């Protein structure tokens, strides 16, 4: 488990390389943090993204939602894309990927390896 707050991959433009929008700057910081922690992703991966709950939520709601599925934006595939792009320059060798989003007290990313035979 890596203590990194997940961030989706933004839709990039050529201009974002020199005049960064806030979402792009957040993504670049996320990418740097992934590399700093030395995250590795296997060819068959299960990525679990723990999305931090808003501070504005009551303690009751926080306790109720802890560990429950995260069903609002950002999309799981966008989070997985951001992770893959941060780790690999070419990620076509990943052939089996599962992405899960859950609510948590603080943000984190868990990387596991899928096992078992394909029928």
What are these regions (language model features)?
Residues 1-119:
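Catalytic phosphate/metal-binding cores of nucleic-acid and nucleotide-processing enzymes, i.e., regions
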